[in-house]
Amino acid sequence: MDGFSQQLEDLYPSCFSPCPSPLGFSEPVIQPFAMNLAPAAQKDFQQHPNRREVTKIPGAGEQSPVQNVRPKDAINPKEADPRSPTADASLVPASQRRKRTFFTQAQLDILEQFFQTNMYPDIHHREELARHIYIPESRIQVWFQNRRAKVRRQGAKATKPILAGHHYSGTSGANRAMFPSAPAPNSSSHQMTTSRAQVQPLKESQMNMFHQNQGFLPYPDSSCNVSRQRFLMSQPTPGAYHLPQASSNVYNQNVKSQNPLWNQQTTNRVYTNMMETVLDLSRRPSQQMPVQPMLMNSFQTNKNIKPEVYTTSPQIPVSTTSSQVSLFANQEPCHMSTTQGGTYGQISPISDSGVSDTSPEPSSDWEENVASVLLNL
């Protein structure tokens, strides 16, 4: 420490007195040291004084700085309340509420007269009215806005009773239509609805009868619907077999049965005659069946026939003189020959199982019915 103070003394001889202090620093050393500090350091040095000064206990005659501070509750409310009459005028805020504008009857008449001609005046018209009746232009604009809103409210109230009247009238009309004693509003539509309701059961009953009678027709007992359709399509026309006139109209009756106004009794009578004819033909004794090439060729088979199993059919001359003459008029019966045994084996058009089979199937009831019908005709 002594060496350091000696160096300072050599560097700054003017700042040290000839009698050094016990700490090794003279009194003037503090002044240039404090002056060489930065401004922030000087401020901190000034704000933080010595502890001895802070912990100084006040005397009896001195007052503590804490006692000089008054609490908030001790402040006079008259000094803090700006609404007090004794408060300063600069502290009282200005009122933001706009004063109400009162119109005289003459001013209202002029505004109402102008409103009848123009409901939406522009800025020029409003300024002209303001100069004429001595009212600010902004007040005139507000008056026109309120007047238009009043017109809209009046229009809405005027339309509500009319709509309510239409609603009640429509409801009463619907109630009158529900009761049979009151006349219907549209008699033609009511009659059409009644007629449709009466025709619908008749149409359904005729359709049911048609399907029931259709089920009695002789078609093969097969689980496949395609074979039934092919059998019905392969049937020749009634004129080729000289059937009675009643049976020739069966196809027309089937078409006419779709008409709901067709007589049900006539349809039942035609079907009854047809069924009697078919049953009578099926009861006759069986004869040798002639071969018809067209009938045999109409059936398409999906089975492969072995080479040793085949049938032969001779060619039959067809008469072209008249379409009404039977195809079997001048033809002699022909016997079918087979290479194996004497049993005639016919392959069904479509297999029930759906798998191709090369073995022929035995004759069925369907083949016997076809043979009996063709022989008797």
Swiss-Prot record:
DNA-binding region: 96-155
GO biological process terms on file: positive regulation of DNA-templated transcription; regulation of transcription by RNA polymerase II
MF annotations from Gene Ontology: DNA-binding transcription factor activity, RNA polymerase II-specific; RNA polymerase II cis-regulatory region sequence-specific DNA binding; RNA polymerase II-specific DNA-binding transcription factor binding; sequence-specific DNA binding
Induction: By activin and TGF-beta1 (immediate early response gene).
Keyword Nucleus tagged: yes
Tissues expressing this chain: Expressed mostly in the presumptive endodermal cells of Xenopus embryos.
Compartments where located: Nucleus
Biased composition (Polar residues): 336-362
Predominant place of localization: nucleus
Keyword DNA-binding in record: yes
Biased amino acid composition, Basic and acidic residues: 70-82
Disordered as annotated region, ranges: 41-93, 334-369
Key words, A-Z: Developmental protein, DNA-binding, Homeobox, Nucleus
GO cellular component: nucleus
Task performed by this protein: Transcription factor which plays a regulatory role in the development of the embryo. Involved in the establishment of dorsal/ventral pattern in the early mesoderm. Activates the head organizer gene cer1 by acting synergistically with otx2 and siamois through the 5'-TAATCT-3' element of the cer1 promoter. Also binds as a complex with lhx1/lim1 and siamois to the 3x 5'-TAAT-3' element of the cer1 promoter.
Family to which this protein belongs: Belongs to the paired homeobox family.
Name this protein carries in UniProt: Homeobox protein Mix.1
Protein source organism: Xenopus laevis
